[in-house]
């Protein structure tokens, strides 16, 4: 029976941006980016000589990302990510803002508690407005 060393145990709390060690070097993706990757894989398969059937998990994930993606084309996805990367956001916050697209600072802070105290409402409102503009201008 093995016991964990209390020194190795870190409280995991996304609200405080505390994540397990395994996530330190991990990158985050927007749901829109995941959809783009899955769509690319699906189109590759459709154009292959021998089309293979996708797993149920793949198809459900594809449907989920199609339903919940906020950005519909590569240019808008890249533009939104670029905008968010210019801000002083943790990669978790960047992904959460890009996936949830809250409309008001209060909503953003309720959904992403780590933003509280790190951003003034006006600064956060500008970020949210910029994201909203990108969403509304996509084709």
UniProtKB/Swiss-Prot annotation:
Secretion signal, residue range per the UniProt entry: none
Record keywords: Chromosome, DNA-directed RNA polymerase, Nucleus, Transcription
Pfam families, per database record: RNA_pol_Rpb4
Induction conditions: Under heat shock conditions, up-regulated in early larvae and then expression levels appear to return to normal during the L2/L3 and pupal stages. In second instar larvae, down-regulated 1 hr after starvation and then remains low until at least 4 hr after nutritional starvation.
GO annotation terms (biological process): transcription by RNA polymerase II; transcription initiation at RNA polymerase II promoter
Single GO cellular component term: RNA polymerase II, core complex
TM region positions: none
Keyword Ligase attached: no
GO MF annotation, one: nucleotide binding
Disulfide bonds: none
Domain of life of the source: Eukaryota
UniProt KW Nucleus keyword: yes
Protein's cellular compartments: Nucleus; Chromosome
Note: This protein is produced by a bicistronic gene which also produces the Ada2a protein by alternative splicing. Three distinct zinc-containing RNA polymerases are found in eukaryotic nuclei: polymerase I for the ribosomal RNA precursor, polymerase II for the mRNA precursor, and polymerase III for 5S and tRNA genes.
Family recorded in the similarity comment: Belongs to the eukaryotic RPB4 RNA polymerase subunit family.
Subunit: RNA polymerase II consists of 12 different subunits.
Function (record text): DNA-dependent RNA polymerase catalyzes the transcription of DNA into RNA using the four ribonucleoside triphosphates as substrates. Associates with POLR2G.
The protein, known as: DNA-directed RNA polymerase II subunit Rpb4
Organism: Drosophila melanogaster (Fruit fly)
Lineage, uppermost ranks: Eukaryota, Metazoa, Ecdysozoa, Arthropoda, Hexapoda
Gene that encodes it: Polr2D
């Amino acid at each position: 029976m093995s016991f964990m060393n209390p020194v190795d145990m870190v409280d995991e709390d996304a609200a405080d941006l505390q994540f397990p060690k395994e996530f330190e070097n991990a990158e985050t993706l927007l749901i829109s980016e995941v959809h783009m990757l899955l769509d690319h894989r699906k189109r590759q398969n459709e154009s292959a000589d021998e089309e293979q059937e996708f797993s149920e998990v793949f198809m459900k994930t594809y449907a989920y990302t199609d339903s919940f993606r906020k950005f519909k084309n590569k240019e808008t996805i890249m533009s939104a990510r670029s905008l968010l990367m210019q801000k002083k956001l943790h990669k978790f916050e960047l992904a959460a803002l890009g996936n949830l697209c809250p409309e008001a600072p209060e909503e953003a802070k309720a959904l992403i508690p780590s933003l509280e105290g790190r951003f003034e409402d006006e600064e956060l409102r500008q970020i949210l407005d910029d994201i909203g503009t990108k969403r509304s201008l996509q084709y």
